[in-house]
């Protein structure tokens, strides 16, 4: 695993390569981007979700991943999420001057999801509200609904953030997942955004 990063005010960027016997992953991000993405995970629906994440968070991101998808896409999906979490943590640096908290409620037709993010340094995920059986649906031919929670678990753990994700409504499995990714994107965008009124670390402890 190799990583590089810069958290200077003008360049909150990071890049990481992660290789295991199950997958090979490269993720590069720029937190102060415009939502430009170059995504290829070999899992088309996941590519679609990560592209939406970039678009609505305004994070520029490159993802290149290959893995044992002939067995199951789980390894590749989770390893990409782990690597994204790591580069997010690296790009944030000491978190000085950020808003820290972000919240968004996002619809996609009949589906509605709410996400609340705290860039706290303490990884925690609360994930609920999906309709019964959502985890068993196969979306796009490869992506099972249960992977949604795994993705958010991996991101929160490795980025060191707290995420409360709640599905308020939804019927179509695709829409339910996409609403969650878009809500997370908007909440993350707000949380990592620089706040010109904040001096130093946004915590009474002096560290995050």
Curated annotation (Swiss-Prot):
Pathway(s) served: Amino-acid biosynthesis; L-histidine biosynthesis; L-histidine from 5-phospho-alpha-D-ribose 1-diphosphate: step 6/9
Q: Reaction catalysed?
A: D-erythro-1-(imidazol-4-yl)glycerol 3-phosphate = 3-(imidazol-4-yl)-2-oxopropyl phosphate + H2O
Q: Which residues form a coiled coil?
A: none
Enzyme class, spelled out? lyase
Q: Which CDD domains does UniProt cross-reference here? A: IGPD (cd07914)
Looking up NCBIfam families in the UniProt record yields: PRK00951.1-6, PRK00951.2-1, PRK00951.2-4
Q: What is this protein called?
A: Imidazoleglycerol-phosphate dehydratase
Q: Which organism is it from?
A: Pseudarthrobacter chlorophenolicus (strain ATCC 700700 / DSM 12829 / CIP 107037 / JCM 12360 / KCTC 9906 / NCIMB 13794 / A6) (Arthrobacter chlorophenolicus)
Q: What is the lineage of its organism?
A: Bacteria, Bacillati, Actinomycetota, Actinomycetes, Micrococcales
What gene does this protein come from?
hisB
């Amino acid at each position: 695993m190799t990583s590089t990063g810069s958290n200077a005010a003008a360049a909150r960027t990071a890049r990481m390569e992660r290789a295991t016997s199950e997958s090979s992953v490269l993720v590069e991000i720029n937190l102060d981007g415009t939502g430009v993405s170059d995504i290829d995970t070999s899992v088309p629906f996941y590519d679609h979700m990560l592209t939406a994440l970039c678009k609505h968070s305004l994070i520029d991101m490159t993802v290149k991943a290959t893995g044992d998808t002939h067995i199951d896409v789980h390894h590749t999906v989770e390893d990409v999420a782990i690597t994204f979490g790591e580069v997010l943590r690296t790009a944030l640096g000491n978190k000085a001057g950020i808003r820290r908290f972000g919240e968004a409620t996002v619809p996609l037709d009949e589906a509605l999801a709410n996400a609340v993010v705290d860039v706290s340094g303490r990884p925690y995920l609360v994930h609920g509200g999906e309709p019964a059986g959502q985890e068993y649906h196969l979306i796009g031919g490869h992506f099972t609904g249960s992977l949604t929670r795994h993705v958010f678990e991996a991101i929160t753990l490795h980025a060191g953030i707290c995420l409360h994700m709640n599905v308020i409504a939804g019927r179509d499995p695709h829409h339910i997942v996409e609403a969650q990714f878009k809500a997370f994107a908007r909440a993350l965008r707000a949380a990592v955004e620089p706040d010109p009124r904040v001096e130093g670390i946004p915590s009474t402890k002096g560290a995050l």
